[in-house]
Regions:
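Non-catalytic, mostly N-terminal accessory regions of nucleic-acid modification and defense proteins
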Residues: 1-173
């Protein structure tokens, strides 16, 4: 169930995109989806690490060691939402644009997979560092609110609400 408070935070996030110049509702939902995926990758990796530690099993993080993007390398931990969300706006933006987004586009490495075909055309469209900083902060607040609700279907409800905004945006121009 999407509460009034959660709807308000989602509306604020939507407004950040619109006032920042990203006015196509499909682009807004697409960018939100990419950013949610990036955050979820970090969260899922952290859960797997904790579970492995509890069971005394090894865990190889997808963010472990150096990650190569093109002909450059970066410490994989820099690509984690939980790391870069604390960066100053300019550094967060360059990290997202130059490292995180290319990383998720090539996550599976198999150029023929359905994932690679879908992500092959993905473009990071957030236009400014300050806008990204505000979006990341707002998304952190949304995730915090979603954790408090503790419903198994909250994510689906949030996405349904986003899609309803898409329908409304189409009607309102």
């Amino acid at each position: 169930m999407v509460t009034g408070e959660l709807k308000s935070k989602i509306d604020n996030l939507w407004e950040l995109f619109w006032t920042g110049g990203l006015t196509n509702p499909l682009d807004v939902i697409e960018q939100m989806t990419y950013l949610m995926f990036i955050r979820d990758l970090d969260d899922a990796d952290n859960v797997r690490a904790k579970e492995a530690a509890m069971l005394g099993l090894p865990h190889k993080s997808i963010f472990a060691g150096e990650i190569q993007i093109g002909d450059r390398k970066i410490d994989g931990s820099q690509l984690k939402w939980s790391t870069f969300h604390d960066f100053p706006a300019a550094k967060m933006y360059s990290t997202m644009q130059e490292w995180v987004f290319p990383f998720i586009k090539n996550l599976h490495g198999d150029k023929e997979s359905a994932y690679s075909k879908y992500m092959g055309d993905a473009i990071f469209k957030v236009p400014t560092p300050l806008m990204l900083d505000k979006i990341v902060t707002t998304m952190d607040a949304i995730y915090e609110q979603m954790e408090q609700i503790k419903s198994a279907d909250t994510r689906g409800d949030v996405y349904e609400y986003l899609l309803s905004k898409l329908a409304t945006a189409g009607v309102n121009g």
